[in-house]
């Protein structure tokens, strides 16, 4: 904390004046009230300890009754000292189409800073979540681990100060750069919460704590399994039309899918949305593309027995749009400067600090749901960072509030939407995984892990993302080959096996698939419906990391009762006479017996252990001998191999 009091004094001397405890649903809320020794300046440090999950949230509330405003220049949410040698840090980094990359490193004397300055999204390049392994190099299923997650969707800063006596001081909160805040008398500045957990069962144990807490408290409908969907984007891109959407709906319905989502390209009147250079802000149906309108699409979805969803990007506009022509003052822009433009050379970000803009963004959703109440799903995108530091709404002396007020406005919009449409499913897409954070997930059901749907790269991205977020929140889609981002040709079996480890969906034009491919997807979707509760609501155990470069990656989910499990195995490299490690399982009941069934089998003959029964103790001590290659006809052989095994208790 750093402040400047109204008289210019830049010091604080806080002392505890009271400690109180209250019950709050399934949690105990402890408040430590601090007061400056001289000034009427107060800090309430809050600790919310959950009774049914191993998680504590902590945040601060800053207030004062000084005669003049107080100037806040640093305002961390939490401070955690760790007095321990040989501590390792696990954290995520990356970029667009390469999100969730895992980095693990020992903490050395000095300062480690993980921060974000995007403004609108905050999890492309780094994440506001970390894990500390207290017993040396990180291990997945043993060892003591502290996990921390800042529950915020805006600019953040995590800082770890390490001295030469093995003392680590961890700070987490809003990134104060360009965000100093003037606090008037009698108002309260509340920092976002930091969630803290502890596990003596390794990194996977800390992940299980985050997942259970997330599903129960920090994710919309977190304990309700998700629909299997087809999204139109990689199938047709902007080429939206009534007949094409009907065809895609019919195809996904025939494969057992439950939901169709029409992506970008459906809107615009004066400026029809033909590409990414126009129309954002003009949320009216393009009647040339969709002469029967959205009501016609919903009618087609009903005909095929599936639900209907739609894509929007309501926080954004294009300079080529009717909205911008009418309200140029609604965009974020520095005074006396031309705006820096984003995607398509025309994209700009709306000023969510402005209540009128908040009303407009809410109305985008409200109008859709009022006019078409049978819309079941909204894909909410955000394809631009805040590149223009300036708000026409905020006064000149409050411009440093812009980033903070933007996210306050965003949360207000989300709260209004959830209050009126509590049952609506909403995905947080932000140029892929830009909004994977626990600040906004209470208002969203899931997030799009990445715009990169390449199955091999998704193994790495989804592995890292699983450190903090449950499978039910991770949208994972089967896409085309060659892949549209990497141009890599990956067999359908492998693509399915990767997608089935998250919230399964499809991102493909089904009419370009062969009957054999559709049949494999049809069987996979049927099998996924059987294992869906285990994957989406179960406990994760990561077994072999792709980042260890052992040629294979493996993880599994177990049901809470440990009567069912799903085991995943993906080969990540291919060499002749390759040695791959034998994978031992985890999370099973050693005293129970499990029958093994392979899902998505393409081999000409069953695996040696197909249908056989093994004890949990055996599987966790010895594992199974997984063949390195598929036994298929010569012309179908390739360098990819993957397995999904379903384990079910035999009583």
Locate predicted features.
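C-terminal beta-sandwich/jelly-roll accessory domains of carbohydrate-active enzymes
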Residues: 573-651
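Active-site neighborhood of glycoside hydrolase catalytic domains
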Residues: 291-293, 325-327, 331-493, 503, ...
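Carbohydrate-binding surface patches
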Residues: 130-132, 140, 546-590
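Conserved, mostly hydrophobic/aromatic
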Residues: 60, 186, 301, 361, ...
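Aromatic-lined carbohydrate-binding/catalytic grooves of carbohydrate-active enzymes
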Residues: 221-363, 372, 376-377
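Short Pro-Gly-centered flexible turn/kink motifs
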Residues: 181-200, 640-648
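Catalytic cores of secreted or luminal carbohydrate-active enzymes
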Residues: 493-544
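Polysaccharide-binding surfaces and accessory modules of carbohydrate-active proteins
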Residues: 1-161, 177, 593-609
């Amino acid at each position: 904390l750093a402040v400047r009091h109204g008289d210019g004094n830049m010091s604080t001397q806080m002392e505890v004046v009271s400690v109180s405890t209250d019950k709050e649903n399934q949690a105990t809320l402890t408040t430590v009230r601090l007061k400056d020794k001289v000034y009427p300046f107060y800090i309430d440090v809050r600790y919310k300890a959950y009774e049914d999950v191993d998680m504590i949230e902590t945040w601060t509330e800053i207030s004062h009754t000084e005669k003049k405003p107080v100037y806040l220049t640093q305002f961390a949410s939490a401070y955690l000292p760790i007095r321990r040698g040989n501590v390792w840090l696990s954290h995520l980094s990356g970029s667009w189409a390469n999100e969730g990359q895992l980095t693990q490193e020992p903490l050395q004397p000095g300062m480690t800073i993980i921060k974000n300055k995007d403004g609108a999204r905050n999890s492309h390049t780094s994440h506001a979540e970390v894990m500390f392994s207290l017993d040396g190099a990180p291990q997945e299923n043993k060892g003591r681990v502290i996990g921390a997650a800042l529950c915020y969707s805006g600019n953040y800063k995590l800082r770890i100060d390490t001295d030469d006596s093995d003392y680590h001081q961890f700070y987490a909160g809003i990134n104060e750069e360009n965000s100093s805040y003037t606090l008037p008398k009698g108002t309260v500045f509340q920092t976002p919460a930091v969630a803290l957990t502890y596990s003596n069962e390794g990194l996977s144990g800390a992940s299980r704590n985050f997942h259970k807490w997330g599903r129960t408290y920090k994710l919309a409908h977190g304990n309700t399994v998700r629909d299997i969907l087809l999204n139109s984007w990689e199938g047709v891109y902007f080429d939206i039309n009534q007949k094409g959407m009907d065809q895609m709906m019919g195809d996904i319905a025939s494969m057992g899918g439950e939901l169709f989502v029409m992506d970008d390209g459906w809107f615009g009147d004066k400026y029809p949305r033909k590409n990414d250079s126009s129309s954002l802000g003009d949320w009216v149906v393009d009647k040339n593309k969709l002469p029967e309108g959205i009501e016609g699409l919903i009618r087609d979805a009903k005909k095929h027995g599936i639900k209907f969803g739609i894509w929007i990007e309501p926080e954004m506009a294009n300079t080529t749009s009717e909205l911008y022509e009418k309200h140029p003052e609604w965009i974020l822009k520095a005074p006396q400067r031309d705006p820096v433009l984003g995607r398509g050379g025309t994209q700009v970000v709306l000023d969510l600090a402005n209540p009128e803009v908040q009303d407009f963004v809410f109305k985008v959703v409200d109008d859709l749901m009022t006019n078409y109440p049978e819309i079941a799903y909204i894909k909410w995108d955000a394809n631009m960072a805040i590149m223009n530091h300036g708000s026409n709404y905020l006064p000149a002396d409050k411009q440093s509030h812009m980033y903070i007020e933007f996210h306050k406005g965003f949360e207000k919009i989300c709260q209004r939407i959830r209050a009126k449409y509590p049952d609506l499913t909403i995905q947080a897409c932000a140029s892929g995984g830009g909004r994977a954070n626990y600040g906004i997930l209470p208002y969203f059901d899931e997030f799009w892990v990445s715009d990169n749907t390449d199955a091999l790269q998704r193994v790495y991205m989804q592995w890292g993302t699983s450190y903090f977020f449950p499978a039910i929140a991770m949208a994972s889609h089967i896409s085309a080959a060659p892949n549209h981002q990497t141009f890599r040709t990956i067999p359908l079996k492998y693509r399915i096996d990767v997608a089935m480890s998250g919230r399964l969906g499809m991102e493909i034009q089904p009419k370009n698939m062969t009957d054999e491919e559709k049949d494999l997807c049809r069987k996979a979707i049927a099998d996924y419906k059987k294992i869906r509760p285990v994957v989406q609501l179960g406990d994760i155990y990561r077994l072999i990391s792709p980042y260890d470069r052992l040629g294979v990656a493996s993880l599994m989910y177990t049901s809470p009762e440990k009567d069912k499990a799903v085991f995943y195995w993906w080969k990540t490299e291919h060499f002749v006479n390759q040695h791959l490690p034998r994978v031992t399982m985890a999370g099973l009941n050693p005293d129970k017996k499990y029958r093994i069934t392979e899902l998505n089998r393409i081999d000409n003959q069953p695996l040696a252990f197909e249908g056989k029964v093994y004890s949990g103790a055996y599987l966790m001590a010895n594992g199974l001998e997984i063949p390195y290659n598929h036994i298929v006809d010569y012309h179908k052989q390739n360098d990819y191999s993957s397995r999904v095994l379903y384990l079910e208790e035999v009583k």
